[in-house]
Amino acid sequence: MYSELIINPDLFYRSNHRQFKCTDCHSEDYSTFPHPGNLRMEAMANCIDCHGGDEQYAKFHFEAIDTAFTESVHSTKHSTEFTCWMCHDAHTYRINARTNENIKETIIYDNTICLDCHSDYRRFQLLTDKENPNILTKHGWLPNQELHFTSVRCVECHTEKKNDSTLVAHKVLPKNKAVKNCKECHSSNSTLMASLYKYQAQEVRSAGGFFKGVFTSESYVIGAARNYVLNVLSVILIAGVILGITIHSVLRTIKK
């Protein structure tokens, strides 16, 4: 039997769609067995069909995601063949970036979505006759390749990040437009703050306002080495300077 026809119940009942019956999404004709043969041609609903224009799901910005996806290289090159379900299995999909505080787990989860096709010859050939390129060879120019692969997601370098409302960019760019400039990430104004660390930054800002978000954000350049002792000494030094200025100001005021 085709593996695509087997639904893992453990994964399904942990997914975001676990409360639905099969026939909520599929034809009622599936209630009979054997299933009619013409059901193989059943048109599959996409995310917008259920979530578009629904205020209950407005915070997820499905319309903005759909627009970005439509402009992506996946959609423009493969049109109707490439749907939401090529990356997001409706039977196992669960929200991750918005709920998982463990960045490493988010990286693994999201990169697995990309690698399910880009490291699988069979799935890759479903959309093209081209040979599936070797990921390691194609990224041979990247310094510390293994560290990058385990520390950032594919979408950090391969998507356009314009819409501030969406957590994960869906406009996948052609390979010749991928980020290759180190300072895009390794700078105080890192693009990672608008992608991988976006949710954490938004949470800090919403909890304490804009200024708290600014003052509690990371001051280190992403990827730089850190020293806990120097961190503590820096805080003590800054606190001492502020205290000294305050005492000096108070004494001057008293003398006047």
Placement of each model-derived feature along the sequence:
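Short sequence/structural segments immediately N-terminal
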Residues: 1-256
